[in-house]
Amino acid sequence: MLNRVQILMKTANNYETIEILRNYLRLYIILARNEEGRGILIYDDNIDSIMSMMNITRLEVIGLTTHCTKLRSSPPIPMSRLFMDEIDHESYYSPKTSDYPLIDIIRKRSHEQGDIALALEQYGIENTDSISEINEWLSSKGLACYRFVKFNDYRKQMYRKFSRCTIVDSMIIGHIGHHYIWIKNLETYTRPEIDVLPFDIKYISRDELWARISSSLDQTHIKTIAVSVYGAITDNGPMPYMISTYPGNTFVNFNSVKNLILNFLDWIKDIMTSTRTIILVGYMSNLFDIPLLTVYWPNNCGWKIYNNTLISSDGARVIWMDAYKFSCGLSLQDYCYHWGSKPESRPFDLIKKSDAKRNSKSLVKESMASLKSLYEAFETQSGALEVLMSPCRMFSFSRIEDMFLTSVINRVSENTGMGMYYPTNDIPSLFIESSICLDYIIVNNQESNKYRIKSVLDIISSKQYPAGRPNYVKNGTKGKLYIALCKVTVPTNDHIPVVYHDDDNTTTFITVLTSVDIETAIRAGYSIVELGALQWDDNIPELKHGLLDSIKMIYDLNAVTTNNLLEQLIENINFNNSSIISLFYTFAISYCRAFIYSIMETIDPVYISQFSYKELYVSSSYKDINESMSQMVKL
């Protein structure tokens, strides 16, 4: 089986071969090395990411294992509480989602009944979800005529003498709990259908949940240490045997991985006496170091490991940065060379445990030299980029694209006096993330050619992006940028499915869309009802000149890095949900998707196989390559 996987990896340059590889990855993790000997763990969830970073046909497959793990993700953002908006109808009043809907009803009734309003002003009322307690309060204030009566009881003729009583329809709604509707007119009332929504847009628009990007960039320097984890092959899969740091110690243990990790953590704790956060700098660490340590992470050690972050029981944090994501695809030695340090080879990963044990002294020496080179290169690069991209600091970002684009957006927006804001709370962050679709939308299954947008950068740099804090609006204003919670109805006739939904049997569903995606969907025949939106009154002007100025500055510093960065930006604009410019990514991806749809409009739908926001699969039998298609590159 290993031979079969090795052959597949060498020829993994087409869709069919990669799909066969995926089948193996459902059962095994592939142990591989790159040309510098850096270990790489390939599993089903990260193969796409790895293929975007490197040519996997050049990797050396060492083995297969089931004794490993994926990165342990941070605890998921809790789902926001489901929400029902307030409905004030002539026949009834339904309060918005609340822990105390009865209190909301009595306050609403006080708008019409001055004696209730006076009692509330003079005495107040404690929150309660008990009808009997509300009635007790009303009676004590001489307002028993407004007592609350359940609709079912009223229909039993028990309370007809109380003509002014407050009749409420009681119900239990899934994922929300008890809810009450005040029935104003018994003759015309019928229980309404109330939309249960995933977000409260009014809440999300609150000023305190948004902050100016520039305010988050002014951070003091945090201590940085270069680190590398080395693993050997055993009968039970890969095993970490050495953790090297610079400046710092090297930890080696062939008998107990637990003790190896505990010694490393004790050392980390000792050097954190004057700071609550430090940065560990690795190279391709997300592909080997971190997942390998995660497999063996000891319980009850005082630290939890989540993705690239270590969090101690007392709140201290260690952030594991991957310098490779700032290298624009350079090998470790090329990265060190281009940033002025002496390139040193590093020990090979995934060697036999016996070989590692026999050569441990030379491996320690080789590791220290390599880490010293990485540390010096990283310090030089971070210093240079922080000058060019001020006030952005390298350790605040997970990849160079984020840092570069944040710098450009901040510079352009500040120069025009309009800053871009970002959400500081999980719920608005989740709302923005929900508006992004990176999935492929399947149209027809057929043999196809793959096309990609020639330059994502050209498309997104000429567009507008939100500036300032958002405002809540019930419906977005044409010509303004907004993100709306929408009820979407699929066209009844044959259509290209431009709005992603994971249930093909549903013709109406609720989702989050940008104003750009709404325009695209309406062009495609969808019916869109907006259920509330975040709208921005101001826009950041086009970014093209700011992008070109920044590219030139970096090019003067390091031409190789700039050329590679420009290539990455042209080909990709991938959403990063931890980015403070998530709003930019949201609209950038929508603009790309609108561009893809404009091309699909020129093609007979029978020839379209699938598409994403930047790629389009067209039937191999399609020959009419029109002018629109010339803006795509065939892969």
Swiss-Prot record:
Protein's UniProt keywords contain Signal: no
Subcellular location field: Virion membrane; Host endosome
Keywords (A to Z) from UniProt: Early protein, Host endosome, Host-virus interaction, Membrane, Microtubular outwards viral transport, Viral release from host cell, Virion, Virulence
GO CC, alphabetical: host cell; host cell endosome; membrane; virion membrane
Induction and repression of expression: Expressed in the early phase of the viral replicative cycle.
Pfam family, one: Pox_F12L
Principal subcellular localization: virion
Gene Ontology terms describing biological process: microtubule-dependent intracellular transport of viral material towards cell periphery
InterPro entries in UniProt: Poxvirus_F12L (IPR005005), RNaseH-like_sf (IPR012337)
Entries under SUPFAM superfamilies matching the protein: Ribonuclease H-like
Self-association state and partner proteins as the record states: Interacts with protein OPG164/A36. Interacts with protein OPG064/E2.
Function: Plays a role in intracellular enveloped virus (IEV) transport to the cell surface through microtubule transport. Together with protein OPG064/E2, forms a complex that interacts with host KLC2 (kinesin light chain isoform 2) to engage the kinesin-1 complex and thereby promote IEV trafficking.
Family, per entry: Belongs to the orthopoxvirus OPG056 family.
Name of this chain's protein: Protein OPG056
